[in-house]
């Protein structure tokens, strides 16, 4: 029996009390779970409002049974109409679909995803079109069979570009090596990658940072038990 494990970690831009990056995890009506990540234009309260709007709408549509590509298009139309095409946002949806036994990924702008399959890590480039700005929009869709060892790592540009202003930027090769070395468990990878990105910004993040890790593993329990752990500093 396979098991889907998901971990997320995020922090705010230095000296900002609210993050413009939003993450949501929601169940799929036909079985499975989706991770939704949005990075809205700007930072602070206004960006937070817009990114929350995006992920909340996406989660609601997924719960109603909409397919991920249709979800991305509908959320785009909503943001475009509400903000008159003046506010952009990235949108990444990574879904473990138990009905099709596959991992489906929908991307609009933002950094590439990193996919670990068969012990090899590769990049999955996104479309360069964010949601909310252009009248028409098409997400990049990719699908992988659900198999043991498959892992998806998604992040916002606060992590992807960490260290750039200090002359210590990440390279894709460094990301790949880091993922291979720290993939188990997913919580550890999410936390250490966030910590390393913060360190590269000298403990003063230059942008909001968010990361998720979705991993397919083996479940060996007799009773299927779902668990969740959340830590939120007050």
Segments the model singles out, each with a brief description of its role:
Residues 16-33, 88-91, 124-171, 203:
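Acidic loop->beta-strand submotif enriched in PP2C/PPM serine/threonine phosphatases
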Residues 204-234:
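Activation on terminal intrinsically disordered regulatory regions flanking enzyme cores
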Residues 35-38, 104-108, 224-226:
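Beta-strand scaffold of nucleotide-dependent catalytic cores
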Residues 48-118, 125, 139, 190-215:
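Catalytic core of PPM/PP2C metal-dependent serine/threonine phosphatase domains
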Residues 1-12, 17-19, 27-30, 58, ...:
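Intrinsically disordered, low-complexity terminal regulatory regions
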Residues 42-64, 150-201, 226-229, 234:
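Active-site-proximal, acidic helix/loop segment immediately C-terminal to a metal-coordinating Asp/Glu
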Residues 39-40, 110, 155-159, 208:
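DG-centered beta-turn motif at the end of beta-strands
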Residues 2-21, 76-81, 111-147, 171, ...:
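PP2C/PPM family metal-dependent serine/threonine protein phosphatase catalytic domain
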């Amino acid at each position: 029996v396979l098991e889907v494990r998901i971990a997320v970690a995020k922090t705010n831009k230095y000296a900002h009390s609210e993050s413009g990056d939003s993450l949501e995890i929601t169940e799929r009506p036909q079985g499975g779970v989706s991770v939704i990540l949005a990075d809205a234009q700007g930072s602070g309260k206004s960006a937070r409002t817009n990114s929350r709007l995006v992920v909340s709408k996406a989660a609601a549509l997924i719960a109603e049974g909409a397919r991920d590509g249709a979800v991305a298009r509908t959320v785009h139309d909503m943001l475009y109409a509400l903000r008159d095409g003046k506010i952009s946002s990235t949108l990444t949806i990574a879904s473990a679909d138990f009905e099709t036994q596959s991992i489906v990924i929908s991307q609009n702008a933002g950094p590439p995803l990193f996919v670990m399959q068969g012990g090899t890590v590769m990049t999955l480039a996104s479309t360069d079109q964010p949601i909310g700005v252009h009248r028409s929009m098409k997400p990049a869709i990719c699908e992988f069979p659900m198999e043991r060892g498959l892992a998806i790592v998604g992040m916002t540009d606060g992590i992807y570009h960490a260290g750039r202003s200090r002359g210590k930027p990440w390279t894709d090769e460094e990301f790949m090596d880091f993922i291979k070395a720290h993939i188990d468990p997913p919580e550890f990878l999410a936390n250490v990658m966030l910590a390393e990105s913060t360190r590269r910004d000298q403990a003063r993040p230059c942008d909001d940072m968010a990361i998720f890790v979705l991993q397919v593993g083996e479940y060996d329990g007799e009773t299927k038990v779902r668990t969740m752990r959340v830590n939120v500093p007050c």
